[in-house]
A protein has these predicted regions:
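Expand to "…catalyze enediolate/carbanion chemistry for C-C bond making/breaking, isomerization
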Residues: 24-334
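Short, positively charged and aromatic/hydrophobic N-terminal segments
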Residues: 15, 21-24
Length: 334
C-alpha cells in the first residue's frame, strides 16, 4: 500500500483513505458497472517531459497513449513535465477509438498528489496507478476524483488502471480487481509491470518468461473474473523485433488484451498480434450465422464443418466481430 498520504485541500485524501472500508462495503452492494469493449492492443508509454515525443504521439497508430509522469521523468523534472502535459492536453485532438491516459507518481510522495491536480486540468480517459498493492490504493483515488468533481458527460470521468508490479499486488489481486465491478469503483484495466516485479522478487528475466507465466496468468484470471481488461508488460529490447513478436503472441495466447510498449517501432507488432486475422473473422461470422439460421433456433449446440460448436462460442464470436468493427472504425477516423 502507498504510505501516509499527504494532506491537500478539496478533497482530503487522508480522510478519504480513513473511511475506505465503509466505502468499499457500500460499493459491493451496488449494481456492477458495465465496461464497454475498447481497443487496447497497443499502449505506448510517452515521457511527459519529452516535447518531441508528445508531439509525435498524435501521429502514431497505437490504441492508447500513456503519458508518463512516473519512471521516465527525473524527480527534478516532475513539475516541468506536469506543466508540459497540461499544455499538451489543452490542444489535444481526441477522436473515437483512441484513449489518452496518464500514469501518475505514487501517492506516498508529493508528486503523486500534484499529478492528481494536473489530472483535473487534463481530464484523460484514465489515470494509471503505479505499484497498486491493495484495494484501498484504487478506492482512495476513485473517491478523490469523485469528490473533486471529475465526473463528466463521458459516463463518470476518468477511469482507473492499476499496475500490478509488486509481490503484495499479486497476493491481493482478487480484492484489487473486485473494486472495478461496481458503480463508482472506476477500475477498468489491470496492467502488468514486470521490471519492478522482477526487481522485488528476483525472478529471472529469461526469454519465454517460463517462471513468470504462472503469475501473468493469475493477473489475466483476476481481470476476467471482474470484467476488466488486462495489458501485458513491456518488452524492453525494442531492437529485437522477433523477440517482441514472440512475446506478443504469447500474451495473446495467455488472454491479454494488449501490450505496454516503450517505442513506436513496437506498435505494428502489438496491433497485429492482438488484432483479428481474416481467417479468425471468417470463422466468427460462420459461427454467428449458424446460430442465427432458422433451423438452429433455440439450439444450444450446432455442428459446423463436422465440429461441435456451443452457444458460448457464438458469444465469443460476437465479441470478436465487435472488435473488428472497432478496428475498422479507428481506420476510418485516423
Amino acid at each position: 500500500m502507498w504510505g501516509p498520504i499527504l494532506f491537500i485541500a478539496r478533497p482530503n485524501l487522508w480522510a478519504l483513505a480513513a473511511c475506505g472500508k465503509a466505502r468499499h462495503k457500500e460499493r459491493m452492494n451496488r449494481t456492477p458497472h458495465h465496461h464497454p469493449l475498447r481497443l487496447r492492443r497497443s499502449v505506448l508509454s510517452v515521457p511527459a517531459i519529452n516535447a518531441k515525443a508528445l508531439a509525435k504521439s498524435a501521429t502514431l497508430d497505437c490504441d492508447v497513449v500513456l503519458f508518463d509522469l512516473e519512471d521516465s521523468v527525473l524527480p527534478e523534472k516532475k513539475a516541468e513535465a506536469r506543466a508540459a502535459l497540461v499544455a499538451h492536453f489543452a490542444t489535444l485532438d481526441r477522436y473515437p477509438g483512441r484513449e489518452h491516459v496518464i500514469r501518475i507518481n505514487p501517492l506516498d510522495g508529493p508528486d503523486g498528489v500534484l499529478d492528481l491536480k494536473a489530472v483535473l486540468d487534463c481530464m484523460p480517459d484514465a489515470v494509471v496507478l503505479p505499484k497498486v498493492s491493495e484495494p484501498q490504493d484504487v478506492l482512495t483515488v476513485a473517491d478523490w476524483l469523485s469528490e473533486a468533481g471529475a465526473d463528466d458527460d463521458r459516463d463518470f470521468g476518468p477511469r482507473l488502471w492499476a499496475m500490478i508490479e509488486t509481490a503484495a499486488g499479486l497476493l491481493n489481486l482478487a480484492a484489487i480487481a473486485e473494486t472495478g465491478r461496481t458503480e463508482g469503483g472506476r477500475l477498468d484495466c489491470l496492467v502488468v509491470g514486470l521490471n519492478d516485479l522482477r526487481k522485488e522478487t528476483g525472478i529471472a528475466d529469461i526469454p519465454g518468461r517460463p517462471y513468470l507465466a504462472p503469475l501473468l496468468l493469475q493477473v489475466v484470471v483476476a481481470a476476467r473474473a471482474f470484467g476488466l481488461d488486462v495489458v501485458d508488460a513491456v518488452f524492453n529490447n525494442f531492437a529485437d523485433a522477433e523477440g517482441l513478436e514472440a512475446e506478443c503472441r504469447q500474451g495473446r495466447q495467455m488472454g491479454f488484451d494488449g501490450k505496454m510498449l516503450i517505442h513506436p517501432t513496437q506498435i505494428d507488432a502489438a496491433n497485429a498480434a492482438y488484432g483479428v486475422t481474416e481467417a479468425e473473422a471468417a470463422e466468427a461470422l460462420a459461427v454467428v450465422a449458424a446460430f442465427a439460421a432458422p433451423e438452429n433456433a433455440g439450439k444450444a449446440v450446432v455442428t459446423i464443418a463436422g465440429r461441435m460448436v456451443e452457444k458460448l462460442h457464438a458469444d465469443q464470436a460476437g465479441r470478436l466481430l465487435a472488435k473488428v468493427d472497432l478496428i475498422n472504425e479507428r481506420k476510418r477516423t485516423t
